[in-house]
Amino acid sequence: MAKGQSLQDPFLNALRRERVPVSIYLVNGIKLQGQIESFDQFVILLKNTVSQMVYKHAISTVVPSRPVSHHSNNAGGGSSNYHHGGSAQGSSAPQQDSDDAE
């Protein structure tokens, strides 16, 4: 199972570490926006004005607002499968879109 997450974990960890704003599209078409606070094998904690626990099985696509380097050999990347966010810095929170899926 670790082999299946060899791309997912470094990608999500880079987004978390660099506090990159992301849009997460769910399989039902809903778009969530925020920053990845932490994640594990099954869920992602997405922080905007509140923290939301989003189950990975409900996610279709994760779209970063800017390109990120997510190579697994980055310094400080580590090999842990569980990543927890630190304290949030004083950055402006991304706004949540209320796009209606039609």
Curated annotation (Swiss-Prot):
<dbReference type="InterPro" id="IPR005001">
    <property type="entry name" value="Hfq"/>
</dbReference>
<dbReference type="InterPro" id="IPR047575">
    <property type="entry name" value="Sm"/>
</dbReference>
<comment type="similarity">
    <text>Belongs to the Hfq family.</text>
</comment>
<protein>
    <recommendedName>
        <fullName>RNA-binding protein Hfq</fullName>
    </recommendedName>
</protein>
<dbReference type="InterPro" id="IPR010920">
    <property type="entry name" value="LSM_dom_sf"/>
</dbReference>
<dbReference type="GO" id="GO:0006355">
    <property type="term" value="P:regulation of DNA-templated transcription"/>
</dbReference>
<feature type="domain" description="Sm">
    <location>
        <begin position="9"/>
        <end position="68"/>
    </location>
</feature>
<dbReference type="GO" id="GO:0043487">
    <property type="term" value="P:regulation of RNA stability"/>
</dbReference>
<comment type="subunit">
    <text>Homohexamer.</text>
</comment>
<comment type="function">
    <text>RNA chaperone that binds small regulatory RNA (sRNAs) and mRNAs to facilitate mRNA translational regulation in response to envelope stress, environmental stress and changes in metabolite concentrations. Also binds with high specificity to tRNAs.</text>
</comment>
<feature type="compositionally biased region" description="Low complexity">
    <location>
        <begin position="70"/>
        <end position="86"/>
    </location>
</feature>
<keyword id="KW-0346">Stress response</keyword>
<keyword id="KW-0694">RNA-binding</keyword>
<feature type="region of interest" description="Disordered">
    <location>
        <begin position="63"/>
        <end position="102"/>
    </location>
</feature>
<dbReference type="GO" id="GO:0045974">
    <property type="term" value="P:regulation of translation, ncRNA-mediated"/>
</dbReference>
<dbReference type="Pfam" id="PF17209">
    <property type="entry name" value="Hfq"/>
</dbReference>
<dbReference type="GO" id="GO:0003723">
    <property type="term" value="F:RNA binding"/>
</dbReference>
<dbReference type="GO" id="GO:0005829">
    <property type="term" value="C:cytosol"/>
</dbReference>
